[in-house]
Amino acid sequence: VLSANDKTNVKGAWSKVGGNSGAYMGEALYRTFLSFPTTKTYFPNYDFSAGSAQIKTQGQKIADAVGLAVAHLDDMPTALSSLSDLHAHELKVDPVNFKFLCHNVLVTMAAHLGKDFTPEIHASMDKFLASVSTVLTSKYR
């Protein structure tokens, strides 16, 4: 459960990402593909090179989903319900892949936010991304 301080930290960190959210999430996805090659199986016929149009497009989708979660911190299950259905029933993404992506989101944010990505922000973002992952995998039964 996110504390009031966590929510403040998450909103603040996401606001610092700002207009770079699509690019940063594309970079996080690219890092995920490099670090965990099995994640590529969900993206047939993709150009996996850095900055490809497909990675940019998917990065923006991820950024939009994260932004939606940030905007609905008090009711993420409702806000992300359709995405949860999509990933569980249609795409059938292995839940471990959310952990891989979340790790790389943290790495990417740390790389770009530098000193603004404090240990406290890191901890709050980690809790937030774990909560998003839990919501996205909640319909896997």
UniProtKB/Swiss-Prot annotation:
Q: Which domain of life is it from?
A: Eukaryota
- What is the documented function of this protein? Involved in oxygen transport from the lung to the various peripheral tissues.
This chain belongs to which protein, by name? Hemoglobin subunit alpha
Q: Coiled coil: which residue ranges?
A: none
Per its record, what are the GO molecular function terms? haptoglobin binding; heme binding; metal ion binding; organic acid binding; oxygen binding; oxygen carrier activity; peroxidase activity
Signal peptide boundaries: none
Q: Which residues bind heme b?
A: H87
Example of a GO cellular component annotation carried by this entry: hemoglobin complex
Record's family? Belongs to the globin family.
Write out the GO biological process terms.
hydrogen peroxide catabolic process
Q: Which residues carry this modification: Phosphothreonine?
A: T8, T108, T134, T137
Q: Which residues carry this modification: N6-acetyllysine?
A: K16
Q: Which residues carry this modification: Phosphotyrosine?
A: Y24
Q: How does it assemble?
A: Heterotetramer of two alpha chains and two beta chains.
